[in-house]
Amino acid sequence: MLKTVHQKLLHHTRPLLAWLKLLWRRIDEDHMTTLAGNLAYVSLLSLVPLIAVVFALFAAFPMFSEVSVQIRHFIFANFIPATGDVIQGYIEQFVANSSRMTAVGAFGLIVTSLLLMYSIDSALNTIWRSTRSRPKVYSFAVYWMILTLGPLLAGASLAISSYLLSLRWASDLDGVIDNLLRLFPLILSWAAFWLLYSIVPTTQVRNRDAVIGALVAALLFEAGKKAFALYITTFPSYQLIYGVISVVPILFVWVYWTWCIVLLGAEITVTLGEYRKLKTEETEQP
């Protein structure tokens, strides 16, 4: 009896262990942590210019003025744990100063923002080991569309949500709405990762693999956010070491951790497809 149970357990766990071994090998071969470090560095250079460009777009549309404030608070509350208020103050000061920049300065901000998108594109295609490249004009058009339409669509979505919540019938669903609002950051992260893993690679990605990889990345992101905030509030030793500039290493570590999660989700997505391909080849062999 015990021998039968043991054999069944081995039968079910052997594929999982083989897949985990393949995942670990790919992470090592792709130098995932090094890629995450590169993206973290570029992100820190591009973060403020990107936010400046996004909120400059909101400022160009008066209808989004109130929504932009809500989006700003949502981003800093849900995507930058514990130190969001301090970082928000610095970034808002920069955004206010950026409105007085010349055309050359504004062009520099846009180029820096596009640099981040290009780096993400390169890193993900490195993980997928895709040798195919898009035409430069097409890539620029996609980056520009994300940079311009992305914030506007997010603003329109939040505006519609606020309008629906203000309707009379919504008051009868307070409990349901509260639960949905708690899940909203997770759902948003899941959707964002799924789009990232589905659209950015220049090779075909199976939708189910992208959904699974995105879900794991979203769950790790939410768990990591809470764990990181708990560490910062419970063990504030970093403040004794860095003093008033402690927000800088905190932000860098968080951005690096975030990119590790994003790239791990990509590795999971691509490994699911590769493992399935290997199993198919083994089955077809005589």
UniProtKB/Swiss-Prot annotation:
The chain crosses the membrane at residues 44-64, 74-94, 104-124, 140-160, 183-203, 210-230, 244-264. The keyword Cell inner membrane applies. Its main location: membrane. Keywords: Cell inner membrane, Cell membrane, Membrane, Transmembrane, Transmembrane helix. InterPro entries: UPF0761_bac (IPR023679), Virul_fac_BrkB (IPR017039). Signal peptide: none annotated. Pfam families: Virul_fac_BrkB (PF03631). It is a multi-pass membrane protein. It comes from the Bacteria. GO terms for cellular component: plasma membrane. It is found in: Cell inner membrane. HAMAP family: UPF0761 (MF_00672). Belongs to the UPF0761 family. This is UPF0761 membrane protein KPN78578_41360. It comes from Klebsiella pneumoniae subsp. pneumoniae (strain ATCC 700721 / MGH 78578).
